[in-house]
């Protein structure tokens, strides 16, 4: 290859494999030599080496499948240094998966890490205590939050909140006032069931909680330390999958000349500048699903009076038994039954006076049509807000419909049926599947629909075998959450004064560069799927299903009701 990238020679087919394997080895050795130079500081050297080696590895793998050379983890792992303290609040399954990954990517003395949990698991804690991590048996409550936290973190430290039912406004406010970096995976309350029985449906939503956060933040005089909220797998990674999908859709549409003239020029410009809201609008995106199918199975079937899941049972029950919630697109012609609109804020969402676990929609993951539940999730708020286009007067010109479509593992589905029979009172025994899992995967991604290519899915297909190779005794579901937590922590360490941020405010390429090695098969693929592609004709002509055949992207076409049998 010459100076201007022109081809100056031809490699014979006989030597093709040998030459490219040796060339790859040469590039890797060159990168090691270059970035061990003392003229480059350690952190920059490691991150530049990571970027170059990851690029080379991916480039060769895509073009020459025979040229697979395993790179040592310490060579290709992006890493940051953190000299302050880290506090884990909660040490459930996600935290247990997060800690070993965190120590691969964040250089910190284990003695600077403290774990707080009110139900210690000695077997899970022992190896970390032996390495110098401190464990404290305690519980963060409304009457002790400040007293507990100030013992373990102060200005410049990092608090990773992986507990449940800690009021987000209170703990974010405390961290803001004390200069502490903060991360969580969901916006929660002290007691989500308090007053829930008689509350208006809109007051049970994440939208309502986010409006409370906005009111609190508006009173601050400075944005303060970085606090990244709702950065797990979903919400979290799903926002970055959505951005990547939009870029890939734009590339494919431009290459295939689906747009022309000034519109094509605008799309190319928005793609270049990552102006995602205008890009989605110009592409014609109507609907975005966070579509997930969990196929993990185990040798220990669910028993009577037992709730089995691959992640937090209490968390699933809490979000599944409250209102279904979704971002509401400007293309929608009518509200669904039991729908309520919000009266304050951007009014970008609606909720249903119907449990999310009992609200079913058709969706798609590669290569399955699934029946998913519209469980309340933070991405329905954050993605909708990020992709909204407003005029100078603040009126919304464009907004897609966004919601979760969750098909959990078989054991969880059986647990939900039993939960309904118990009038939503949680079973006396709960279990999160780990070592007993024998097969399956967690398939999680953004299904972006309504553009000229019909549908596009971007996300992770992570098998139980792959997740165990990365962190033993964990499952695919917790792995996707854990690596997202670590990536966000690294971004916070490098950007410590950004105030409150949602996943959509973080650079998607930064997060995905770190996360991809932990996500199994990273897929970005087009599909011709629509909710009307394959519809049942049972009782055709006698039940008159409420669908809109002229516009497949209306919510009524996704919603599964009794009249669609």
Go through the PLM ranges and name each one:
Residues 110-127:
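NAD(P)-binding Rossmann-fold cofactor-contacting core
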Residues 130-142:
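Rossmann-fold cofactor-recognition segment
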Residues 8, 12, 20, 31, ...:
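Short linear motifs in low-complexity or flexible loops
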Residues 68-83:
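A short, basic/flexible loop-to-alpha-helix module at the beginning of a structural domain
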Residues 248-565:
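C-terminal catalytic/substrate-binding lobe primarily of soluble NAD(P)-dependent oxidoreductases
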Residues 87-90:
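Conserved N-terminal Rossmann-fold NAD(P)-binding element of oxidoreductases
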Residues 94:
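Hydrophobic/small residue at the entry helix of a nucleotide-binding pocket
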Residues 172, 186-223:
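Rossmann-fold NAD(P)-binding glycine/threonine-rich loop
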